[in-house]
């Protein structure tokens, strides 16, 4: 898989005024974006992705986890509807069963859903890795990074998932948002540390390891938790979401900060202190500002407006991979 650890972008669709899927795919390609993540199967979008050359992360609806987990035939029909018809012409990177459902009432559904999807894909002769996407709220301890552990609420679910993924060599997807840590406690977190703008290692020295930015510190806390939970040092992480809002009234939400974070990120994702030299496959959140998301910063994570004009410029050719 050499050369695929590029920068992808999440294509959210919670907007009433978004461009047609074919225009969106063309916009990805025009901006040298190599990969796309979609949160649920949409056949119009999958049609537009045919022969596009884009790598695709395909999510399931969280509401589909229950039937996917309990009914192998439902998983088979899901694969038959959304993967099989496109498999030759769409480059599926991963299928992620559920987004940020651990910990919670649906958490126990994730691994059975993953296994049923894996069996359905195998029966269809398709080799697409199946994983899930977690928020960093699964961590009980995240500071310092080497002490990272999963919370007592998350560990009973996450532990078996981590072991399962490690045995198949499939990465775990994690959503990493320094913005929310910064905006919740701006007096304790330096802005340049959150924005990946610091030229000096600041704020965190962990067993002699220096962290110059929060993105690496959060990732390494998850790596430490994964290792403690039985994933060993072989299980890789993919950052399935990260972003910074350009407006919406949140503390530190500005076009200037969003542009700094995303451009610094594109240049940066070449490895963390705990996993040096290993490029981190990363998906920015998000392609567009989406007017059907909750009001405030949630509507302002896009790099583009719905009319396809830039909110701020991102140079994707600068990717460190």
UniProtKB/Swiss-Prot annotation:
<keyword id="KW-0326">Glycosidase</keyword>
<comment type="function">
    <text>May provide a degree of protection against microbial invasion of germinated barley grain through its ability to degrade fungal cell wall polysaccharides.</text>
</comment>
<feature type="active site" description="Nucleophile">
    <location>
        <position position="241"/>
    </location>
</feature>
<protein>
    <recommendedName>
        <fullName>Putative glucan endo-1,3-beta-glucosidase GVI</fullName>
        <ecNumber>3.2.1.39</ecNumber>
    </recommendedName>
</protein>
<keyword id="KW-0378">Hydrolase</keyword>
<dbReference type="InterPro" id="IPR000490">
    <property type="entry name" value="Glyco_hydro_17"/>
</dbReference>
<dbReference type="GO" id="GO:0005975">
    <property type="term" value="P:carbohydrate metabolic process"/>
</dbReference>
<dbReference type="Pfam" id="PF00332">
    <property type="entry name" value="Glyco_hydro_17"/>
</dbReference>
<feature type="active site" description="Proton donor">
    <location>
        <position position="100"/>
    </location>
</feature>
<dbReference type="InterPro" id="IPR017853">
    <property type="entry name" value="Glycoside_hydrolase_SF"/>
</dbReference>
<keyword id="KW-0611">Plant defense</keyword>
<keyword id="KW-0732">Signal</keyword>
<dbReference type="InterPro" id="IPR044965">
    <property type="entry name" value="Glyco_hydro_17_plant"/>
</dbReference>
<dbReference type="GO" id="GO:0006952">
    <property type="term" value="P:defense response"/>
</dbReference>
<comment type="similarity">
    <text>Belongs to the glycosyl hydrolase 17 family.</text>
</comment>
<feature type="signal peptide">
    <location>
        <begin position="1"/>
        <end position="6"/>
    </location>
</feature>
<dbReference type="GO" id="GO:0042973">
    <property type="term" value="F:glucan endo-1,3-beta-D-glucosidase activity"/>
</dbReference>
């Amino acid at each position: 898989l050499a050369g695929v650890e590029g920068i992808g972008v999440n294509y959210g669709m919670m907007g009433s005024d978004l461009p047609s899927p074919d225009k969106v795919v063309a916009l990805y390609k025009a901006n040298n974006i190599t990969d796309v993540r979609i949160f649920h199967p949409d056949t119009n979008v999958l049609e537009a992705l045919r022969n596009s050359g884009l790598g695709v992360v395909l999510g399931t609806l969280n509401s589909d986890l229950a039937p996917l987990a309990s009914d192998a035939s439902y998983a088979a029909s899901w694969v038959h509807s959304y993967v099989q018809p496109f498999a030759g012409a769409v480059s599926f990177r991963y299928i992620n069963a559920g987004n940020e459902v651990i910990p919670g009432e649906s958490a126990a559904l994730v691994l059975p859903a993953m296994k049923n999807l894996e069996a359905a894909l195998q029966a269809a002769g398709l080799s697409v890795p199946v994983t899930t996407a977690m928020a960093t709220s699964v961590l009980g301890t995240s500071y310092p990074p080497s002490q990272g552990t999963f919370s007592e609420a998350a560990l009973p679910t996450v532990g078996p998932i981590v072991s399962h993924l490690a045995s198949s060599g499939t990465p775990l997807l994690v959503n990493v948002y320094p913005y929310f840590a910064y905006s919740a406690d701006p007096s304790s977190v330096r802005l340049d540390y959150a924005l990946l703008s610091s030229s000096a290692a600041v704020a965190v020295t962990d067993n002699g390891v220096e962290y110059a930015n929060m993105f690496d510190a959060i990732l390494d806390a998850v790596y430490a938790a994964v290792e403690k939970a039985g994933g060993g040092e072989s299980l890789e992480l993919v950052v399935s979401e990260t972003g910074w809002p350009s407006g919406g009234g949140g503390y530190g939400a500005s076009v200037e900060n969003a542009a700094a974070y995303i451009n610094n990120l594109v240049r940066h994702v070449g490895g963390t202190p705990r996993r040096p030299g290993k490029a981190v496959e990363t998906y920015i959140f998000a392609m567009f500002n989406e007017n059907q998301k909750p009001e405030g910063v949630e509507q302002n994570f896009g790099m583009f407006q719905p009319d396809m004009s830039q909110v701020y410029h991102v140079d994707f050719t600068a990717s460190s991979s």
